[in-house]
């Protein structure tokens, strides 16, 4: 008997820029200042694995630890059971970390209970905050509401199969970022995750009981419904539903579990709380779930959500399902995180608008996602391709990268001038074409004066490319003559320093070198 509790905190925070670094350029510092105090929804995810007992997993809300003198049940004092549970948790941790998709970090005792100057997760939960300098707040339980300090809680629960849709899935289509030809797939519970723009906690519980005992109890319930079917047709319908559940479990080998999910939001403004209540209901409706605003069980569910206290969850607030369907109700998205790599560029999260440091070159190769650093920027006219390229190139240059650009529309002339003026002409060199001063190059100029075979072949290939059309293949005699002319010219400029290496002198010497043998041999 154990409980898997996934607790996702979504807290409104403001972006704090780092503008004190001396190496920041004018544009980088202006970028940081532009996003100063930008609000965004930060995500903190916790996963709690709790060992419980058969008796405690069946207790209801009227018999929690709040009503008893002994908090720890006697069964937990069994060292052998505790050792087996800890070993199972260790195996679970290794499996998750080895997957490469999720990283689990086990919390130390000081991170749970807190220490001087730093709050633990229990203290953060009681204050509905994730800051390290939280202050404890009074918790008020009133007939009409529950308060934590100045914040008023609003709770929506998924605790009955009648509130769930007819079918669930691992993912769903997100219309805002999807097109006619491509789908943006998010998890089934994404509407109550990062897409719900308010302070809230999304609790997801899976109660793993004795699978065989659960099916045995369902068999007994089905027989009872069968015997009472003559008194009510509803009993016959329920019996058929139970039989279908049992058939699925036996034929497909599915694990019977109990599940519960709730969204706990809060605000210190009653008018804003009304808006939040409507937003939560709308997001649940997007999941095709029936919004159930729970005003009675808020204190009990808040108490059961304390890290490590999941065993006090009231059994009447859970429903039976299978393990796969229960996992579909888990939130699987988070907001983007900054890369740990020192090399990267600043990008902005399209959902929250928060700047992030992203490495799109080295980190994907280290993780095996890509095998090269090529980038293909695709978009219609006016979509910001050149704007993004300017942004990327500038930051790469500021981090020491060597950049060579071929600019066909003067899109990067301004950036080059900025770098040129800032470096006093050392960088930001921009070659452009004009009728008076066209772009030219000299393949015959070599600083050390050494021409190897590769250099000679590249010069010959260049001249053939300029000479012949794409669909016109050179003759063998032309290739031999050109190769001899290039070799003779290179030998000439090596022996005679008065000859300036360029196309003009090559043409003049080629006329002499090629025309004379041609006349003697009558080659056409």
Regions found by a protein language model. Give the residues of each.
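Glycine-rich phosphate-binding loop of nucleotide-binding enzymes
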Residues: 1, 342-432
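Extended, folded cores of ATP/NTP-driven motor/assembly subunits in large transport
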Residues: 1-333
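Switch/coupling segment of Walker-type NTPase motor domains
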Residues: 4-17, 35-36, 391-495
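Hydrophobic alpha-helical scaffolding
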Residues: 75-78, 82, 232-235, 266, ...
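Short, well-ordered alpha-helical packing segments
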Residues: 86-93, 97, 264, 277-281, ...
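A glycine-rich phosphate-binding loop feature that marks nucleotide/adenosyl-phosphate handling sites
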Residues: 108-116, 296-304, 413-415, 477-486, ...
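Long, K/E/R/D-enriched contiguous segments that form extended
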Residues: 490-511
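Single conserved hydrophobic/aromatic residue that forms the stacking wall/gate
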Residues: 512-524
């Amino acid at each position: 008997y154990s409980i898997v509790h996934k607790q996702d905190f979504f807290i409104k925070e403001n972006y704090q820029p780092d503008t004190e670094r001396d190496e920041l350029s004018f544009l980088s510092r202006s970028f940081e200042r532009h996003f100063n105090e930008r609000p965004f929804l930060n995500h903190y995810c916790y996963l709690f694995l709790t060992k419980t007992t058969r008796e405690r997993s069946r207790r209801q809300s009227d018999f929690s630890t709040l009503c008893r003198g002994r908090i720890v049940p006697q069964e937990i004092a069994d060292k052998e059971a505790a050792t087996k549970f800890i070993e199972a948790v260790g195996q679970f941790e290794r499996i998750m970390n080895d997957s490469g998709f999720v990283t689990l970090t086990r919390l130390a005792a000081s991170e749970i209970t807190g220490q001087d100057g730093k709050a633990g997760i229990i203290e953060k939960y009681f204050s509905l905050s994730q800051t390290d300098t939280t202050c404890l707040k009074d918790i008020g339980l009133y007939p009409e509401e529950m308060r934590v300090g100045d914040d008023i809680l609003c709770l929506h629960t998924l605790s009955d199969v009648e509130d769930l849709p007819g079918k669930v899935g691992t993912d769903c289509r997100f219309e805002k970022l999807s097109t006619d030809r491509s789908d943006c797939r998010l998890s089934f519970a994404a509407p109550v995750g990062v897409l719900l723009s308010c302070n809230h906690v999304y609790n997801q519980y899976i109660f793993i009981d004795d699978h065989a005992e659960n099916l045995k109890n369902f068999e007994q319930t089905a027989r009872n419904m069968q015997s009472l079917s003559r008194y009510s047709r509803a009993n016959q319908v329920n019996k058929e539903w139970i039989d279908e559940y049992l058939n699925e479990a036996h034929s497909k080998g599915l694990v019977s579990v109990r599940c519960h999910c709730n969204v706990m939001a809060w605000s210190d403004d009653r008018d804003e709380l009304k808006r939040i209540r409507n937003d939560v209901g709308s997001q649940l409706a997007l999941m095709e779930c029936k919004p159930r605003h729970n005003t009675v069980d808020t204190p009990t569910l808040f108490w059961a959500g304390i890290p490590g206290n999941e065993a006090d969850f009231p059994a009447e607030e859970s429903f039976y399902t299978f393990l796969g369907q229960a996992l579909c109700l888990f939130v699987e998205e988070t907001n983007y995180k900054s890369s740990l790599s020192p090399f990267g560029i600043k990008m902005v999260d399209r959902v929250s608008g928060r700047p992030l440091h992203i490495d799109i070159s080295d980190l994907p190769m280290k993780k095996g996602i890509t095998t090269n650093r090529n980038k293909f920027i695709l978009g219609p006219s006016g979509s910001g391709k050149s704007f993004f390229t300017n942004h990327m190139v500038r930051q790469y240059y500021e981090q020491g990268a060597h950049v060579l650009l071929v600019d066909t529309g003067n899109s990067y002339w301004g950036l080059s001038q900025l770098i040129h003026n800032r470096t006093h002409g050392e960088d930001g060199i921009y070659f452009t074409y004009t009728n008076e001063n066209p772009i030219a190059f000299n393949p015959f100029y070599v600083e050390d004066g050494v021409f190897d075979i590769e250099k000679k072949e590249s010069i010959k290939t260049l001249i053939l490319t300029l000479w012949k059309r794409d669909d016109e293949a050179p003759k063998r005699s032309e290739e031999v003559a050109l190769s001899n002319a290039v070799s003779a010219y290179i030998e000439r400029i090596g022996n005679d320093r008065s000859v300036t290496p360029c196309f003009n002198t090559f043409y003049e010497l080629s006329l002499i070198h090629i025309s004379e043998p041609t006349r003697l041999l009558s080659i056409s």
